[in-house]
Amino acid sequence: MSNLEERVKKIIVEQLGVDESEVKNEASFVDDLGADSLDTVELVMALEEEFDTEIPDEEAEKITTVQAAIDYVTANAQ
């Protein structure tokens, strides 16, 4: 697991209050990790802050799984 992937997963654990073992790459924030719409907004904001990037709303809507978050940050982090 890359350092970037570890950082993304750590943010997910902190933001959603889930156990680290639940944060698998294929996990859906809503269906598997119990996030609601406010949780997902706060998660995107935490990712923006951690990786010093801005995630446009239309892109944020596509970040629905752990892997999607990792992929977005990998492609767009400063």
From Swiss-Prot:
What does the entry give for GO biological process? lipid A biosynthetic process
Cell compartment(s), UniProt: Cytoplasm
| UniProt-listed InterPro entries | ACP, ACP-like_sf, PP-bd_ACP, Ppantetheine_attach_site
Q: Which PROSITE patterns match?
A: CARRIER (PS50075), PHOSPHOPANTETHEINE (PS00012)
- Report if keyword Cell cycle is assigned: no
Q: Where is the Carrier domain?
A: 2-77
Q: Which residues carry this modification: O-(pantetheine 4'-phosphoryl)serine?
A: 37
Kindly provide the PTM information from the record. 4'-phosphopantetheine is transferred from CoA to a specific serine of apo-ACP by AcpS. This modification is essential for activity because fatty acids are bound in thioester linkage to the sulfhydryl of the prosthetic group.
Q: Could you tell me one molecular function GO term of this UniProt entry? A: acyl binding
Keywords of the record: Cytoplasm, Fatty acid biosynthesis, Fatty acid metabolism, Lipid biosynthesis, Lipid metabolism, Phosphopantetheine, Phosphoprotein
Pathway(s) where this gene product acts: Lipid metabolism; fatty acid biosynthesis
Looking at the UniProt record for this protein, which Gene Ontology cellular component terms does it annotate, in alphabetical order?
Answer: cytosol; membrane
Give the SUPFAM superfamilies listed for this entry: ACP-like (SSF47336)
Q: What is its main location?
A: cytoplasm
Q: Which family does it belong to?
A: Belongs to the acyl carrier protein (ACP) family.
Q: Which NCBIfam families match?
A: acyl_carrier, PRK00982.1-2, PRK00982.1-3, PRK00982.1-4, PRK00982.1-5
Cited function: Carrier of the growing fatty acid chain in fatty acid biosynthesis.
Annotated protein name in UniProt? Acyl carrier protein
Q: Which gene encodes it?
A: acpP
